[in-house]
Amino acid sequence: MVIKIPNTFIKATSLLSLILYFLIIATSKSNSVLADEVVDQEDDPEYYILDETPSILSNVTISSKTRLLVSHYKKIKKGMRCHVESYNICNGVKANKGTSLLHCCKKHCRNVLGDRNNCGRCGHKCGFGQRCCGGVCTYVNFNPNHCGKCTRKCASGVKCEYGYCGYA
């Protein structure tokens, strides 16, 4: 006795298996993240802690109301709105113990020492595989002084490969 399987059933199962295969491949690739993207999320605080009072408030005589205002501006939220002419709270202000330099780029406060889209100056974008290290676009995949992220140095004699020290 031979069991006959209809052609439509065979076609449907093969089509279904192909669809499942492509769905699995598509979802697994979208979840994979480059190592430097993960580092950005870990090292990215929500606020800039200012090293000095913004120039917009430096001429104000200190009263009880302005003390509250000045203490509010000791930290600036990332991407806070600004205006170059009328409300420039981040015009060359140093933050995070000198590791950040804030400028008003397209109506938002940006760190020109570490922002890939505003590296060194407003609007200067770093290319693929580059990060903004101290205001300079730097390739971090094979650089032993900036391996995978800015200022991560490999030990002497150890190569930086694909963003990892001693990758093998």
From Swiss-Prot:
Record's keyword terms, sorted: Apoplast, Glycoprotein, Plant defense, Secreted, Signal
Positions bearing the site annotation: Cleavage: R67, L68, K78, G79
Residues bearing attached sugar chains per UniProt: N59
InterPro entries in UniProt: Stig-like
Tissue-by-tissue expression: Highly expressed in flowers, and at very low levels in leaves.
Gene Ontology BP, a term: jasmonic acid mediated signaling pathway
A Gene Ontology term for the protein's cellular component: extracellular space
Signal peptide segment: 1-30
Intracellular or extracellular location(s): Secreted, Extracellular space, Apoplast
Similarity comment: family membership: Belongs to the STIG1 family.
Physiological role: Involved in the regulation of cell death induced by extracellular reactive oxygen species. Only the processed peptide, and not the full length GRI can bind in vivo to the extracellular domain of the receptor PRK5. The GRIp-induced cell death is superoxide and salicylic acid dependent.
Subunit structure: Interacts with PRK5 and to a lower extent with PRK4.
Protein's name according to its UniProt entry: Protein GRIM REAPER
Source species of the chain: Arabidopsis thaliana
Organism phylogeny: Eukaryota, Viridiplantae, Streptophyta, Embryophyta, Tracheophyta
Gene of this entry: GRI
